């Protein structure tokens, strides 16, 4: 059996860290949504008991360091799977960008393996299992728009956000998420209004969504990396209704209602930033799985 499955990137419309927990993680409130910048995974069931990864991108491991490999290994051990799998990944999501590319790939792998290994797991069971690998993966299993709490693994679905344009810009730097969280001072930052964001999404209020964006991690990443702030400022100067860093960075995204204005923001970033994308929110039904027996 062979299948292919799409793994969309995500952005954080709001990201709040409330306090540091006893287990070392931060208690978070994040509103996230998937976008139509996506990787594609191709899975082939093997009779031989092995996991083979083929990543069509540089600098991405094809062994146990890869979340996809970890996802496959976890399912094999948990359900005593004797079959193997070959997974080919066609990468489009930037690496180490704050867009959950690795987490989305792992989520897609879990869903694909559930099919080709005929495990019969529900989406809820897959999401619960995914939390053993990484905090962002549960959201990526569900996709769409959702509130994530706990350390990010507790997911409450929200309506999809209204149609708009999203311009992404990633500078040629990398950011360490553990370092950013370690340096975050939760008592000394402005916190986003998560409830207002949720209400705006439920009401389909795009202006309210724009006004409610916020990310406490900007207080650390922008201070350490001034080029991230310059990208955000440039987006706003070219007409973005809102601009925010996604995750711990370094990618910044702009939210824009009109195509013409979005194109102006996009053109204003090209040449200024190494990687620039113009995308839309992910639509229901786009996260397709194709099966070939």
UniProtKB/Swiss-Prot annotation:
Presence of keyword tRNA processing: no
List GO molecular-function terms, semicolon-separated.
Answer: 4-(cytidine 5'-diphospho)-2-C-methyl-D-erythritol kinase activity; ATP binding
Statement: the UniProt record of this protein carries the keyword Transferase: yes
Positions binding ATP in this chain are: 94-104
Q: GO:BP terms for this protein?
A: isopentenyl diphosphate biosynthetic process, methylerythritol 4-phosphate pathway; terpenoid biosynthetic process
UniProt xrefs under NCBIfam families: ispE (TIGR00154), PRK14608.1 (NF011202)
User: Would you tell me the protein name for this molecule?
Assistant: 4-diphosphocytidyl-2-C-methyl-D-erythritol kinase
Keywords associated with the record: ATP-binding, Isoprene biosynthesis, Kinase, Nucleotide-binding, Transferase
Family as reported in the entry's similarity comment = Belongs to the GHMP kinase family. IspE subfamily.
Which pathway, per its entry? Isoprenoid biosynthesis; isopentenyl diphosphate biosynthesis via DXP pathway; isopentenyl diphosphate from 1-deoxy-D-xylulose 5-phosphate: step 3/6
Q: Where is the active site?
A: 10, 136
Q: What does this protein do?
A: Catalyzes the phosphorylation of the position 2 hydroxy group of 4-diphosphocytidyl-2C-methyl-D-erythritol.
Reactions accelerated catalytically: 4-CDP-2-C-methyl-D-erythritol + ATP = 4-CDP-2-C-methyl-D-erythritol 2-phosphate + ADP + H(+)
Q: Which PANTHER family does this one have?
A: 4-DIPHOSPHOCYTIDYL-2-C-METHYL-D-ERYTHRITOL KINASE, CHLOROPLASTIC
Enzyme Commission (EC) number: 2.7.1.148
What is the organism field in this record? Listeria monocytogenes serotype 4b (strain CLIP80459)
Say which enzyme class the record assigns: transferase
């Amino acid at each position: 059996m062979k299948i292919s499955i799409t793994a969309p990137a995500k952005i954080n419309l709001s990201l709040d860290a409330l306090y540091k927990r006893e287990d070392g993680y931060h208690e978070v409130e994040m509103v996230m949504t998937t976008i139509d910048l996506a990787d594609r995974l191709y899975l082939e069931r093997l009779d031989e008991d092995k996991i083979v990864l083929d990543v069509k991108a540089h600098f991405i491991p094809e062994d146990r360091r890869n979340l996809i490999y970890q996802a496959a290994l976890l399912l094999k051990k948990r359900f005593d799977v004797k079959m193997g799998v070959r997974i080919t990944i066609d990468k489009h999501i930037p690496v180490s960008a704050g867009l959950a590319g690795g987490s989305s790939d792992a989520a897609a792998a879990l869903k694909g393996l559930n099919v080709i290994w005929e495990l019969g797991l529900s989406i809820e069971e897959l999401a619960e299992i995914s939390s053993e690998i990484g905090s962002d993966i549960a959201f990526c299993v569900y996709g769409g728009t959702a509130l994530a709490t706990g350390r990010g693994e507790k997911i409450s679905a929200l309506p999809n956000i209204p149609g708009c344009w999203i311009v992404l810009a990633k500078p040629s730097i990398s950011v360490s998420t553990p370092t950013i969280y370690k340096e975050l001072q939760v008592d000394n930052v402005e916190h986003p209004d998560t409830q207002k964001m949720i209400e705006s999404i439920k009401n389909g209020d795009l202006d309210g969504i724009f006004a409610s964006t916020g990310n406490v991690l900007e207080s650390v990443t922008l201070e350490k990396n001034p080029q991230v702030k310059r990208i955000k400022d440039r987006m706003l100067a070219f007409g973005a209704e809102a601009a925010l860093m996604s995750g711990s960075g370094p990618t910044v995204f702009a939210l824009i209602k009109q195509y013409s204005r979005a194109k102006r923001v996009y053109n204003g970033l090209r040449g200024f930033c190494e990687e620039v994308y113009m995308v839309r929110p992910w639509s229901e039904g786009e996260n397709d799985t194709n099966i070939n027996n």
